[in-house]
């Protein structure tokens, strides 16, 4: 037989004489043991059966076997029933010796050659060239039923059936398993012949190196199986109703079924249910082995009695064998698939059902770590995900951003790398609310800057004005950008005042000075210009005293590690306004000590200061009114902030209204108010170059008296103070929010320019000389949004 797989496993492929002899023995066993005479069938089914049983040579020592078998091969002349002649034409009409030049199928050509030789032995040699067209197998051949030519479209048919019954039988099988000529069903049949009926289970010559004792055991084993278990199914029409043994479904009379005489005459199966009980494949050519009432193919029946070697596919007859992974091997065959080193008692790795030693497995199949690039050995732990591999260590299997270990915890694969959280996958530090994040990472540059500002030591010449001042300071959250802004504005103020000693030895030591400080983070809904000014008790004072008070303010901001927090988080961490009021009052007390000509201002605002100046300097009221007309108007300017967007609005100067607004805004964040108040104090102190009451009054006026909206040129008035409206509850829409804060540098430049322009212009009309400036009385409130 020209089977490449069989030639690789067996030194001598089965010959045509082997198939013929096997068929004869099988027929004799069934005829003599059960009374069934299959020798009466036509030569066509007989030759097909010789193809089936070719790989299952069953040695049955019987003298009657040869005679009966020879009679069967010769054409079934002995004991043949007359029913065979009704549907099978004479053999000389159906088969003849094939010509030497005819190309036969590479898989089944030896089988057909054997059948032609058998037919030629009976029919003679007179029709060698007269029926060449019959040898060209056609799937849809057309002929009458008496000729039997319709059976030639199959490579095998069940014995004892008419052509219409053959078609009825094959209609019960899947199309891909019907053995049409040159079809997938034919290839399936040949494959199952080799698999279900391995020749090495019956013939010594198909085995490799067997000892004399093992050869003897093989012959005894094969003969016993044939005698006790071998059989072939018979296909007939059912005469009565009975259930199918395979699927338990009822069968009715007239159905075509399969009988197995060794299991009992009352048991029958659908043609598609006649399968092996182990592999569930159709029993090829209806050849079966039975044991304990179950059907088996030849391979699995042999394995129920003897183990089979997984390497050579032969039955193990020796007393010793190796068992591994639920399978068995000969002792010498359990070796590495690559280097053939025997693995008995040694460590090995199974891959695709084949054993490998550790060295060969590492060489052929080891993976490389995606982090360190080293080989992951078989003795090392390995983590794998979506085609990627890592060492199972804290260093290799870790977050790509923060390098925290991911062993035993969920991870986030993204773009070929793994992360511990979504924040790390974006290159950001994890937020406190991120429960999936690992250990806290290193603080950002902004947080480091804030921490450095908060921990800076005080200057050497600082004097403690109030011993209990530290106890009144809270710990509001602040940002590093606010500290940078305060330090820069302090330097500008000191340069404007001409205090050189403070510039050389003062300030805040070690404070970084970025070229472009980040913007102040304002996260409140609305920022009132009046609220910014309302917290100041005094804008007068020595520059040194103001500098000395700054470290206390900066020290209260040391706890912040994340600059940009959500609005809700900032509000939760904000202290009450009482703490802010105490801090502002202490700053005013310090400033008052160095400014004795000016009395302490009340907490509520600047109104009493205006009244006192009117009483003391009434003769100069007109002059002050003229100065008021020449003063620049305070404007609202836009300050872009990336994270938030606030709204700003102007209020009136009435102190009672400011008290009400202060109580109404208890929940506002004190951090942003303290930042804005500090900016305003620094701006007012920076713009003051003299200490005369008139200059101080002008600076005070610039802060709050004439707050003119730059958009609609309207101002707030105390007349409409009782009608101040309240903003609705803020809804967070996301995105970028715009905040409005006074820009000190621009305000200072504009004020100087407007002062110069007004000095060149002719004097304004009705202006008082020594009194306080008059307050404008418009009745409009402006909201910039």
UniProtKB/Swiss-Prot annotation:
CDD domains found in the cross-reference section: LIM1_Prickle (cd09415), LIM2_Prickle (cd09418), LIM3_Prickle (cd09420), PET_Prickle (cd09827)
InterPro entries tied to this protein: LIM1_prickle, LIM2_prickle, LIM3_prickle, PET_domain, PET_prickle, Pk/Esn/Tes, Znf_LIM
Family stated for the protein in its record: Belongs to the prickle / espinas / testin family.
Gly residues compositional bias, start-end: 67-79
Polar residues biased stretches: 15-25, 641-653
GO biological process: dendrite self-avoidance
UniProt domain PET: residue ranges: 135-243
Biased composition (Low complexity): 1-10
GO molecular function, one term: zinc ion binding
Protein name: Protein espinas
GN (gene name): esn
PANTHER family (UniProt xref): LIM DOMAIN-CONTAINING PROTEIN, PROTEIN ESPINAS-RELATED
Region Disordered, residue ranges: 1-86, 125-146, 427-484, 638-679
Biased composition (Basic and acidic residues): 459-469
Biased segments, Basic residues type: 657-666
Swiss-Prot/TrEMBL keywords: LIM domain, Metal-binding, Repeat, Zinc
All copies of domain LIM zinc-binding, residue ranges: 242-306, 307-367, 368-430
Species of the source: Drosophila melanogaster
Top-level taxon in the UniProt lineage: Eukaryota
